[in-house]
Swiss-Prot record:
Stated name of the protein: Peptide methionine sulfoxide reductase MsrA
Active site: C52
Cited function: Has an important function as a repair enzyme for proteins that have been inactivated by oxidation. Catalyzes the reversible oxidation-reduction of methionine sulfoxide in proteins to methionine.
Family stated for the protein in its record: Belongs to the MsrA Met sulfoxide reductase family.
Source organism (scientific name): Salmonella agona (strain SL483)
Length: 212
């Protein structure tokens, strides 16, 4: 598949078949030693895609109220894809991060603020120097409330961009969450294990106005 093709989403009919077996990952988060899979009572889940998941995961695990994070794949068709398959552009997935958070400490709207202010949501099928459908900007809401908040935040951020003189249209995908597949264990908490590793995310200098 050529680089040109990787800028266009594969159809479900043409996606790779994948496999039934999930990727094996460590039981505990390498940074805070919380469970990588369990969701404690009262906590909620959010899914975001904003480029290379190494830097995105680190961005969110540093936030107060975030219980755990995981790198993975969302928004595609191929079950339990490998990193190589996702990078081929033939699975339909975006590199995404699963965030388990305590809404009593950090609100979903605060996670959205981190999302919008720390990448460029106008670049379509790339983020910075990373090209391909897996690097697209996306929010995958799990509830009607998350969906409404995501759409409202996109409108506010687009208006804030215009006020700052940036009239590029936002290309961020907002779609109901499809299955999230954990990435291989080597990608989990990658920048903790490899402190000098690559991190290609960065904002555009615009702040998300607060919700009403």
């Amino acid at each position: 598949m050529s680089l040109f093709d990787k800028k266009h989403l594969v159809t479900q009919a043409d996606a790779l078949p994948g496999r039934n077996t999930p990727m094996p990952i460590a039981t505990l988060h390498a940074v805070n030693e919380h469970s990588m899979t369990n969701v404690p009572a009262g906590m909620e889940i959010a899914y975001f895609a904003m480029g290379c998941f190494w830097g995105v995961e680190r961005l969110f695990w540093q936030l107060p109220g975030v219980y755990s994070t995981a790198a993975g794949y969302a928004g595609g068709y191929t079950p339990n894809p490998t990193y190589r398959e996702v990078c081929s552009g033939q699975t339909g997935h975006a590199e995404a991060v699963r965030i388990v958070y305590d809404p009593a400490v950090i609100r979903y709207e605060q996670l959205l603020q981190t999302f919008w202010e720390n990448h460029d949501p106008t670049q379509g099928m790339q983020q910075g120097n990373d090209h391909g459908t897996q690097y697209r900007s996306a929010i995958y809401p799990l509830t009607p409330e998350q969906n409404a908040a995501a759409h409202a935040s996109r409108e506010r951020f687009q208006a804030a961009m215009a006020a700052a003189g940036d009239h590029r249209p936002i290309t961020t995908e907002i779609a109901h969450a499809t299955p999230f597949y954990y990435a291989e264990d080597e990608h989990q908490q990658y920048l903790h294990k490899n402190p000098y590793g690559y991190c290609g995310i960065g904002g555009i200098g615009v702040c998300l106005p607060p919700d009403a």
